[in-house]
């Protein structure tokens, strides 16, 4: 685990171009900025090529979209591939809504992601494995989560992050589990979206997308855990504020002190 990538990120200040969920766009922008990256957001297809050109990494969030936005997502994804920019996809609720799965499947036929990050229900859906998802939440299902993540990675030929109490990161063969975290991530709408964009930021500072993905997950989970451990009586509202503070101030040494992964 190359936690020194966090220092590289803060030194290089990579631009991350986001097609964002309007519900969480401010959380994503603030989270990236606090960590040390530079977020840009746009929904104008005419500038997609130039925006991708400026970016070190691209993150496409499927949380809230219209037909026009689907075309924008497609254009940006194709531009990212054409310009060889690392591309992260967050397939929100594809496990709960069939239309969303159809849209995501169509998009993934038109461009290739380097990393896909989702919960168990979303990753299972993309792997065509049965799972009972609940809206944007993972829901409940019976299955080997590592096998599900590996199946998705092998099917789509990319790194997959299956987020949950334990984050599973795999390229289809190698597997890393991040054991850090806090249940407060589940009550902070936008924490998953924030992580997806942070993954893109780490991908911008190393060509090794598997290393970038696992490091991003560990950094984010460990920082969230430290907030709960160091802030008295933190709740859903105050957690959001303290998380941003911690994204800005937490050092590599502090993360190493609590890091738990296998």
From Swiss-Prot:
Chain positions recorded as ATP binding sites: 117, 163
Enzyme Commission code(s) on record: 2.7.1.50
Positions annotated to bind substrate: 41, 190
Co-factor requirement: Mg(2+)
InterPro entries: Hyethyz_kinase, Ribokinase-like
Keyword Ion transport among UniProt keywords: no
Source taxon at top rank: Bacteria
Keyword list, A-Z: ATP-binding, Kinase, Magnesium, Metal-binding, Nucleotide-binding, Thiamine biosynthesis, Transferase
GO molecular function, one term: magnesium ion binding
Pathway involvement of the protein, from the record: Cofactor biosynthesis; thiamine diphosphate biosynthesis; 4-methyl-5-(2-phosphoethyl)-thiazole from 5-(2-hydroxyethyl)-4-methylthiazole: step 1/1
GO annotation terms (biological process): thiamine biosynthetic process; thiamine diphosphate biosynthetic process
CDD domains: THZ_kinase (cd01170)
Catalyzed reaction equations: 5-(2-hydroxyethyl)-4-methylthiazole + ATP = 4-methyl-5-(2-phosphooxyethyl)-thiazole + ADP + H(+)
Top-rank EC class of the record's enzyme: transferase
SUPFAM superfamilies tied to this protein: Ribokinase-like
Pfam families per UniProt: HK
Family to which the UniProt record says this protein belongs: Belongs to the Thz kinase family.
Function recorded in the entry: Catalyzes the phosphorylation of the hydroxyl group of 4-methyl-5-beta-hydroxyethylthiazole (THZ).
Protein name: Hydroxyethylthiazole kinase
Lineage: Bacteria, Bacillati, Bacillota, Bacilli, Lactobacillales
Gene behind this protein: thiM
